[in-house]
From Swiss-Prot:
Comment field (misc): Part of the eccB5-eccC5 operon, which is essential for in vitro growth.
PROSITE patterns membership: FTSK (PS50901)
Chief location: membrane
Binding positions for ATP per the UniProt entry: 499-506, 876-883, 1178-1185
Effect of gene knockout: Mutants are defective in the secretion of EsxN, PPE41 and PE_PGRS proteins.
Localization, UniProt: Cell inner membrane
GO molecular function, one term: ATP binding
Keywords: ATP-binding, Cell inner membrane, Cell membrane, Membrane, Nucleotide-binding, Repeat, Transmembrane, Transmembrane helix, Transport
UniProt organism field: Mycobacterium tuberculosis (strain ATCC 25618 / H37Rv)
Protein role: Part of the ESX-5 specialized secretion system, which is responsible for the secretion of EsxN and a number of PE_PGRS and PPE proteins, including PPE41.
Record note on quaternary structure: Part of the ESX-5 / type VII secretion system (T7SS), which is composed of cytosolic and membrane components. The ESX-5 membrane complex is composed of EccB5, EccC5, EccD5 and EccE5.
The protein's name in its UniProt record: ESX-5 secretion system protein EccC5
């Protein structure tokens, strides 16, 4: 039985003690000594005495010093001189020998002290080196010690990948200082100098220290020498690596034709292939040929670059595990596996001595017969080669096969994986062995949930959030997941679950969720189940009362991810507010208070535990990297309010590192890569066999258990019911048993289990992954008749769905499908819309829903038009749903108000979709560009209403529209204008199109925008850009609807950076945040969706309003007043009748009434008080001549004849005299000769007539010297008003040849001479009409211009006004800067 090993905290190694030693200065040879002065004096005196004595002797004649006697004084002299000058030749020293010996002894003592210091440093080096690189023969005894597998590939452990090969010499960690005042070679005292030299020689190296090579420096090493020595060293290297490096960090491979030499490596976990499994576990990576090795380990070289030396770098070692390959077969195919640059993360050891491996000197270790290794020397710190000549490197380590096998067998008892299995603990087998037995469920199809939960009602008890999910692998004991916080004795509050495809992750997620549901009633436990992908793991729980929401496919839209996070933040805020209202700090305290209150018969708002399951969260982090920090914050803040995160993914990588710090428990199934396993906190998960549901349960670093998850989605058989005459199989749980097999390096097939339960089948894939039966196409269990066999899990879920309980919904459906208008109105009113129909007392219309994920609701999106927001602006790009928004607004008003209360008049310039509202009783008109008259009449009608209400409100004493509504619909006493309208809405779909088509009309609309709201006339417009609106009216829209904008700069409700997040979907928009959220920008925005303008009974794709028309028509028979239209022909008598009743002031009433205004259906007069002339133009058959005939008919009605032949008029009655130019002779009978002074129809006649007219007008010129009173009374002349009527002026020559040029000077002085000029001209070539002097003069006099049927391509005619196609008799009467459409009264004209 294997024993578990978890890497403990590394022990502190012996510390190398570097020393800084300053060498002692050796002695110098003493210099010659000078003589004392007294000795010199004595010598001189003695020599003098001796000389005197000799002189006296010779002087006396004595022969004492004669002959042989002369020797005595000679010796005396020499002796004295020797005494005086001894040492002058250097033979005498400074000191005596005893003193010199003493100084030598002192120097030697100092060297001994330095030797001890150097030796202490050397001993620390030896202890340190042997700590990290012990002798191979000591490794077997150290197996299982804390020193095992201590190397770390984190870039900080400089011994990772460093392996001992023998013992040798190295320089000490001593810095030598030069002696001070060092004697020269001549001055050096020989004894101390020799001693210092020998000291330096022996202390410059440290002997018998481990010598190492690094796997991270060279891509391979060639071991060259006697085979037995080579194999002995390779065994030592393998044992060193296997002891100090875990199998998760270093893996080893042997390629050899001599398998007997390598049989012992089968025991080492480092030689196991985690991707291939056989009966003995991981398949051994021992191969007989390069071809076999390359075929099995092709993935090892895939995507890897050249070898990169990394030992000098502080970065983490990658890739891991580092791979060591022992090449013990001489095969030329190695050239196809490795090049001179090597392979990243791989180190080869060649044992063949082939030239392919030995050609590079720095990668060669040469043996001799004595076991001495020679190699190129390297710097100990940088591993750089410092010499190109091989030196003595080390005396090789040797390990025999027996020693190596003993070590390997001892190491085989330990595995990193087994550190998580807690082997050796003998737990008593108490209680149930499976989930159903634990809950006392005999029949999953017949569960008494009341009884089941009766014993688990204590939300504060130990069983809270504690549920079984599988069995321990070592003893089959039922394993529990406790999601409570660590301070409550649990494993949570949050956790992760990981496992590659086919590892059983989805099954485990379901099992944990269902087990928790069995342990808690829905009042106490709620789930939010989210899946970034399809949701296969969570969809089966739809409809279960424990489940608040199931959210799937989050990866399809990042906005949904942000929405989900907002919902979680909102739930934290909601729970915090509940706790604050009760005066408590957290959910635990709140539920304690609630339990006490319920015991007293008083209830409080529930605050159940909330488990948020997020499947495939790694995809979330990949798409939205900021989610890591957000979820980490949610986890930290939510724990106090019983919000628990359970996050699952196929893989976990470094980007989730911050989140993992806050995770308690970890359920880790098989990992795809070592990195994923490391990130999940269980490195050996990558080595798990391909068995669904098999994994590790990590509670803490020391408490990690291997388990087998229970499969609740097994077939369900009702107890007591036979199957094909046989009794249904009992649900059992036991442990698999496999017969023992011989353990070798060869692949050993896995035999079939002879005991244990049926395991859900899995299918192996070529890449080593497995697929669960749920993931296999056609994997559902069906009998021969195709009937699906029910599963235990689904049977339990079906029963849970029958429990009547409505959970709190903290996730509302995404804004993908618009709500029907009646459902929206019902939600807004709080009742069915048809009940108390028309009782609304305001003008608030719901048009859609506002998505508030933070508040967990979707309230109606409303438009309030009763106050400052009377006018509504809808902004949006093309295709954003502006027309639909208009339809919805009208339908909403129709469902909340009666046709007497609100009326709508629509101008559809965007599409025909708005015509679908035309049959709603509240809609009086829908006109578009194909009905320009209807458009003009609609605007004119509402403009007339504004003007009429200005007058009538004043007469009735109505101060505001609120008073008007109270009097008309609220029963308040007081007079009300009887205009037949309530609040009226002018709806313009595409303001810009209307403005471009009709300049005159848009000015009238602008008047309504600015003045209408005060009198109950509202304007609702749509536009792509706000800049399309005329500047004077941009501030006139108090209500604003922003859909997806064409330019985010137009956003006013939210900041532009948020407005760009509106999706490209019709009806989607954004409004400002309408609640307080301290951590949010108030202009961050909330997403909106316009409702569908149809009832809920219609299909979801129906946007026509027919259903609303039918529903509203059943409730009311009233109808909005239609727009009044002029008839196609309007007789002059009818105009005169209207004129007789006209009481208006300042419009020329009582004068020539010649047309009806479309604006207010009132007569149009030739108002001579403002202008004395009129021009008429239009295409053929448009009614120009008829216009003249009507005017002449009115002249005859209002004026007395004024021709020269006519009798004098009655006193006080004005008279008229007509001068007629009629080339087509159609007006000759319009007036009699009593009115027509002259007429002409050809050029000569016109010339003559103009001369006479000019003469007559010249006589009316005011003479000089008139008084002011005379000028004002125009008393200087008397006689009839002169009307110059010219039909078809284009038939007369233009320019200087114009026959009318004599009358032209009087046009601008017409008021002084009583002249009125009325001219018609065809429209063709109107742009060149200025060449005619008469028309030019009329333009200068600002004469009104009636443009009848015309070609708009002629461009602007006056100001920004254009002509256009019009029916006969219809025209645009243009003044200086305004225009109004009129219908000319018809008069019969001679043809």
């Amino acid at each position: 039985m294997k024993r578990g090993f978890a890497r403990p905290t590394p022990e502190k190694p012996p510390v190398i003690k570097p020393e800084n030693i300053v060498l002692s200065t050796p002695l110098s040879i003493p210099p010659p000594e000078g003589k004392p002065w007294w000795l010199i004096v004595v010598g001189v005196v003695v020599v003098g005495l001796l000389g005197g004595m000799v002189a006296m002797v010779f002087a006396s004649g004595s022969h004492v010093f004669g002959g042989i006697g002369s020797i005595f004084p000679l010796f005396m002299m020499v002796g004295i001189m020797m005494m005086m000058f001894r040492g002058m030749g250097g033979g005498q020293q400074q000191m005596s020998r005893p003193k010199l010996d003493a100084m030598r002894a002192q120097f030697m003592l100092m060297l001994d002290m330095l030797r001890e210091t150097a030796q202490e440093s050397a001993d620390s080096m030896d202890a340190n080196y042997r700590w990290f690189h012990p002798a191979p023969n000591t490794l077997a005894a150290a197996v299982g010690s804390p020193r095992m597998w201590e190397r770390k590939p984190d870039g900080k452990d400089l011994n990772f990948g460093v392996v001992r090969v023998g013992v040798g010499m190295t320089r000490p960690e001593v810095t030598w200082g030069e002696p001070q005042n060092m004697p020269t070679d001549i001055e050096l005292e020989p004894v101390t100098g020799k001693a210092l030299q020998e000291f330096g020689r022996y202390q410059s190296v440290v002997y018998n220290l481990p010598k190492m090579v690094s796997l991270l420096v060279e891509p391979w090493y060639a071991l060259v020498g006697e085979r037995e020595q080579v194999l002995g060293l390779m065994r030592a290297i393998i044992c060193q690596l296997a002891f100090s490096h875990g199998p998760d960090h270093v893996q080893m491979i042997v390629v050899s034709s001599d398998l007997d030499q390598w049989d012992w490596v089968k025991w080492l976990p480092h030689f196991g292939d985690s991707r291939r499994h056989d009966a003995a576990g991981n398949a051994r990576m021992v191969y007989t040929s390069v071809r076999e090795f390359a075929a099995e380990q092709a993935e090892l070289f895939a995507g890897r670059g050249s070898f990169t030396p990394r030992h000098a770098s502080s970065s983490a070692q990658t890739p891991t595990p580092h791979t060591v390959i022992i090449a013990d077969v001489d095969d030329p195919q190695w050239e196809y596996v490795i090049s001179a640059e090597g392979v990243d993360g791989v180190t080869f050891f060649d044992l063949t001595g082939s030239s392919m491996w030995t050609d590079i000197p720095e990668r060669k270790l040469q043996f001799d017969k004595t076991g001495v290794i020679e190699a190129l020397p390297r710097d100990r710190d940088t591993w750089m080669v410092i010499d190109d000549k091989a030196w003595f490197f080390a005396l090789t380590d040797q390990v025999s096969i027996a020693e190596a096998e003993e070590f390997a067998q001892k190491l085989a008892q330990w595995r990193l994986a087994e550190a998580y299995e807690e082997i050796g603990q003998r737990v008593a087998h108490i209680g149930a062995r499976d989930i159903l037995s634990y809950y006392g469920i005999d029949d999953p199809g017949n569960i008494d949930f009341d009884s089941l939960w009766a014993s688990r009602t204590d939300t504060m008890g130990r069983s809270r959030l504690r549920a079984p999910f599988g069995n321990r692998s070592d003893n089959g004991e039922l394993l529990f997941l406790d999601m409570k916080s660590l301070d409550e004795g649990g494993d949570g509050p949050h956790g992760v679950m990981s496992g590659t495809t086919g590892s059983g992750k989805s099954t485990l997620v379901r099992t944990v969720i269902e087990s928790l549901m069995l342990s808690h009633p829905p009042e106490e436990l709620q789930f939010v189940l989210a899946d970034l992908k399809g949701g296969s793991a969570v969809k089966p729980f739809a409809g279960v009362p424990h489940v608040s929401r199931i959210i799937t496919d989050l990866e399809e839209d990042q906005a949904l991810m942000e929405r989900f996070l907002d919902a979680l933040w909102g739930e934290i805020a909601r729970r915090k507010a509940i706790c604050d209202s009760a005066g408590v700090d957290d959910a635990k305290e709140y539920n304690s208070v609630r339990a006490r209150m319920r015991a007293r018969g008083q209830d409080m708002a529930p605050l159940p535990m909330l488990v948020v399951v997020i499947d495939e969260f790694y995809e979330w982090f990949r798409i939205m990297p900021t989610a890591v920090d957000v979820l980490d914050s949610i986890g930290r803040q939510g724990r106090a309010y019983w919000i628990h995160l359970m996050m699952a993914s196929q893989t976990i990588e470094s980007r989730a590192e911050k989140l993992m710090e806050n995770m308690g428990y970890r359920l880790v199934l098989k990992a795809r890569t070592a990195g994923a396993a490391q990130a999940a906190g269980v490195p050996n998960a990558v080595n798990l066999p391909a068995q669904a549901g098999l994994g590790y349960f990590r509670k803490s670093l020391e408490d990690i258990i291997r388990f087998q998850a229970e499969f609740l989605w097994r077939d369900y058989f009702q107890p007591g019911v036979s199957i094909d005459g046989e009794e249904a199989p009992a649900l059992v749980h036991s442990i698999d048993y496999i017969r023992p097999q011989l353990f070798t390096n060869s692949f050993t097939p896995l035999e079939v289990s002879v005991g244990g339960p049926d395991i859900e089948p899995v299918v192996a894939q070529p890449n080593g992954e497995v697929l669960e039966s749920d993931d296999i196409e056609g994997g559902e269990d069906e009998d021969e008749e195709g009937v699906r066999t029910p599963k235990v899990g689904t049977v339990i879920i079906d029963q849970l769905r029958k429990i009547k309980f409505e959970p709190y919904r903290l996730w509302q459906p995404p804004l993908t499908q618009p709500v029907a208008i009646d459902d929206l109105v019902n939600r807004f009113l709080g009742r069915p819309w048809h009940k108390e129909y028309g009782s609304a007392c305001n003008l608030v219309f719901p048009i859609g829903i506002i998505d508030r994920p933070y508040k967990h609701d979707q309230p109606p999106w409303t438009v309030d038009t009763s106050g400052p927001g009377a006018n509504v602006l809808i902004l949006g790009a093309g295709g954003s749903g502006k027309t639909t928004a208009l339809q919805t607004l009208i339908c909403s008003a129709a469902l909340t108000h009666t046709p007497q209360q609100v009326q709508f008049y629509c101008l559809a310039y965007s599409s025909t979709a708005l015509t679908t509202v035309s049959r709603i009783p509240h809609v009086g008109e829908v006109a578009g560009p194909t009905d320009p008259y209807g458009v003009r009449r609609t605007v004119a009608e509402l403009l007339a209403l504004v003007r009429e209400r200005k007058r009538s409100f004043l007469e009735c004493g109505i101060a505001s529209m609120e008073m008007f509504r109270r009097r008309k619909f609220g029963g308040e006493a007081g007079p009300v204008p009887d205009d037949g309208f309530g609040d009226v809405y002018l709806v313009i779909d595409n303001y810009r199109a209307l403005a471009e088509e009709n300049e005159v009309l848009i000015e009238q609309v602008n008047v309504i925008i600015n003045q209408g709201p005060s009198f109950g006339v509202h304007v609702v417009v749509t536009a792509d850009r706000e800049s399309e609106l005329r500047p004077p009216v941009r501030s006139g829209f108090g209500s604003r609807i922003e859909l997806r904008l064409a330019a985010v700069e137009d956003a006013k409700l939210v900041r532009s950076r948020f407005a760009k997040d509106v999706p490209v979907k019709p009806g989607r928009g954004m409004v400002a945040v309408n609640y307080v959220r301290l951590d949010s920008d108030p202009q961050a925005g909330l997403h909106t969706l316009v409702a569908r303008p149809a009832l809920g009974s219609t299909p979801d794709n129906v946007f026509e309003c027919d259903s609303v028309v039918a529903a509203v028509s059943r409730l009311t028979s009233a109808q909005a007043p239609p727009v009044r239209r002029l008839p196609a022909r309007f007789g002059v008598e009818q105009v005169r009748e209207l004129a007789s009743r006209d009481t208006r002031q300042g419009v020329g009433a009582g004068g020539i009434a010649w047309a009806i205004s479309e604006l207010d259906l009132a007569p149009v007069y030739l108002n001579f008080a403002e202008n004395s002339h009129l021009m008429v133009t239009g295409r053929r058959e448009c009614g120009r001549t008829t216009t003249l005939a009507t005017i002449m008919s009115e002249i005859g009605r209002l004026y007395a004849p004024g021709a020269s032949s006519a009798p004098p008029p009655a006193p006080g009655r004005p008279s008229a005299q007509v001068w007629l130019v009629d080339p087509r002779r159609q007006l000759l009978t319009a007036l009699g000769s009593d009115y027509v002074e002259r007429f002409a129809y050809n050029l000569d006649g016109v010339v003559a007539m103009m001369g006479e007219l000019a003469a007559a007008l010249a006589g009316r010129e005011p003479p000089p010297g008139l008084s002011a009173e005379e000028l004002l009374s125009r008393s200087w002349w008397s006689g009839p008003e002169i009307f110059l009527i010219v039909d078809d002026i284009q038939q007369l020559p233009p320019g200087f040849d114009s026959p009318l040029h004599k009358a032209v000077p009087f046009v601008n002085r017409a008021a002084d001479v009583g002249l009125h000029v009325i001219v018609t001209r065809t429209f063709g070539g109107w742009s060149s009409a200025g060449s005619d002097p008469m028309l030019r003069a009329l333009h200068q006099a600002n004469a009104p211009l009636l443009v009848m049927d015309a070609d708009p391509d002629e461009g602007f005619i006056r100001g920004k006004m254009k002509g256009g196609p019009l029916p006969r008799g219809r025209g645009l009467l243009m003044a200086e800067d305004t225009g109004v459409f009129v219908q000319v009264a018809a008069t019969e004209v001679r043809r």
